[in-house]
């Protein structure tokens, strides 16, 4: 996989947004992408930028509401192919440990 995206789809509201965020993530299932959600965003991997943008568009459209904000950052690796997890593994190799704290 060569295209990575960091996606954040947020309905603008004072209410809880868990259901809406879940709808955006569920929409990714209909696309040829892999993804991992964290508390701040969802990292998406796709073979092409077109695949990534189609998935992002579906996630955005899946969120109900009158005011939706979507933030997308794209890393388009055209010179080599590797998974996003490899980026984290390289940092962890340099650290000699997992790239996270032991605190809870």
Predicted regions and their residues:
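Charge-rich, low-complexity N-terminal segments
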Residues: 1-104
């Amino acid at each position: 996989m060569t295209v990575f995206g960091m996606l954040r789809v947020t309905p603008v509201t004072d209410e809880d947004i868990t259901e809406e965020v879940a709808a955006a993530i569920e929409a990714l299932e209909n696309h040829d992408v892999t993804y991992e959600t964290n508390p701040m965003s969802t990292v998406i991997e796709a073979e092409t930028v077109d695949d990534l943008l189609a998935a992002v568009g579906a996630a955005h459209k899946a969120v109900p509401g009158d005011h939706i904000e979507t933030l997308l950052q794209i890393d388009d690796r055209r010179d080599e192919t590797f998974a996003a997890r490899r980026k984290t593994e390289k940092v962890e190799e340099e650290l000699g440990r997992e790239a996270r704290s032991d605190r809870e």
